[in-house]
């Protein structure tokens, strides 16, 4: 056998022994452009046993066959390590994949590099799943056991909770980015394995008062559903939306917001959950989620038996609460949409009861099947651990062959650069820096906007994007004054017309009634002083008029207009003033006092004068007080009319809903 160094056209190099033109014995081979390195034993051009090192520092130590990893071996990839069997370059049949930083691990069977068959997955928080797998996901029958609730709420990292099952084919050995992001964004990322949730009955009992309280007549009417075979969403009553139903329905008083493993959108606060409470799910799984029949039970007595869909109670089932009360019927996304004991007239309770009973029986069968699958999974796990121990021995043999190959390469070509040790050293240094200064690394991750334009927030402009900064930062500013300039002239013109008409009205009123007492002037002065800090009012009469019309005081410059236009302007002011809210009643003293001299002159007809206050006068008249009082009296009447209409509509809807 001869040996030496051979440089390939792609930049790779082989340094070691060869026979008949093929690598044979011990040697080192680097990949294209010197990237990657295999060091170990060879047989007629193929690797046999040795160590392969990637530029990132990831390594494989074990056996090979036909240029692929085959047999027993250990792969270190990122923060994960796989120990076990390999088949034609993929993980399988038995093996253990574990995290180097947390207790997260999978022990069981593999196929094509993914969990497949039976296995046990232990999560970073200590929770476990035991059962069947397919394509790297929980699929079949299995049991999910959570940790105590207090621990599940403390551990927040998605890597530690690992609610989605572990994956094996990643570029850097970490959890899939989308799965990690989903777990981080979801509330389930902080409460691994808990899918049942209920609120305290005391607080919700206080909120549910009145006609729609729990168990009342109208509350039962509100919960009745159409027994159609079509979708529930198409038959939902128009009285409420989905969100309203989730807040008002009777199921919300005891339970029903649920945590999915990955796809929850909100995080309701649980009440009165002991820190030692645990939860167990036994049943069917599909595509890594609870689907089919199953039983979820807490150690505090809460239990659900029935159908599931996407980690939520969906279908027929029965929920038992810690206080012993039950909730039976049909669920849709964790909400009871068709209850048995909540209906006003239980006409079709028999059919619903049969469906609930069948669902409970199916859930119990699925739980029993899951327990049998757990036994098989535990036996597969024991075998996988034995293969992992054997893989450790294979890795030790591979390291020994690697050392021999390096010695042979140094003898044949002393100037040959071996990149493998540098790759490993660089990775160890990076890992040591992270362990020594974890706080500094955390502080360096969110860089300032100058360093990272990716953290651009609305309203800030990174310095590295000068082209986009004028458009984003300055474009909203000039656009805001333009609408105000366009809108100001039209209301201003109307305002000036109303001011002029009202001012002329008041002037004519004072001219026609010279015998006015001095008391209104004092009241006007008091009302003016109240708003003197905001507006300067030179004429108290004008200020009083505009406080009645606008609710604030405006300085007026009343020009002279032809007398024939006064009636038209007065009509416009009266019609427009009806649309404006009325001020407090104490400001209407002056108009009332104006009518006193008239009452003294005509003492023989006091009742007739009083009746005139409720009758609208001719627009040509100068006194506007009765029309203003009519406007004040019309406000409560319109409110009462609207309330009566709403009450009639509500009763009609309830009656129709009861009939359906």
UniProtKB/Swiss-Prot annotation:
Ranges of compositional bias, category Basic and acidic residues: 437-454, 562-571, 598-612
Keyword set, alphabetical order: Cell membrane, Endoplasmic reticulum, Membrane, Phosphoprotein, Repeat, Sarcoplasmic reticulum, Transmembrane, Transmembrane helix
Domain of life: Eukaryota
Source species taxonomy: Eukaryota, Metazoa, Chordata, Craniata, Vertebrata
Tissue expression profile of the protein: Specifically expressed in skeletal muscle. Weakly expressed in embryos and neonates. Abundant in young adult muscles.
Cytoplasmic side stretches: 1-638
Annotated MORN repeat ranges: 14-36, 38-59, 60-82, 106-128, 129-151, 281-303, 304-326
Renumbered residue ranges of the record's region Disordered: 228-247, 437-631
Family classification: Belongs to the junctophilin family.
Protein name: Junctophilin-1
A Gene Ontology cellular-component term: plasma membrane
Function: Junctophilins contribute to the formation of junctional membrane complexes (JMCs) which link the plasma membrane with the endoplasmic or sarcoplasmic reticulum in excitable cells. Provides a structural foundation for functional cross-talk between the cell surface and intracellular calcium release channels. JPH1 contributes to the construction of the skeletal muscle triad by linking the t-tubule (transverse-tubule) and SR (sarcoplasmic reticulum) membranes.
SUPFAM superfamilies found in the cross-reference section: Histone H3 K4-specific methyltransferase SET7/9 N-terminal domain
TM helices/strands, residue ranges: 639-659
Effect of deleting the gene: Mice are unable to suckle probably due to defective E-C coupling in jaw muscles, and die shortly after birth. In skeletal muscles, triad junctions are reduced in number. Mutant mice developed less contractile force and abnormal sensitivities to extracellular Ca(2+) were observed. Sarcoplasmic reticulum is often structurally abnormal.
Coiled-coil ranges per UniProt: none
Organism for this UniProt entry: Mus musculus
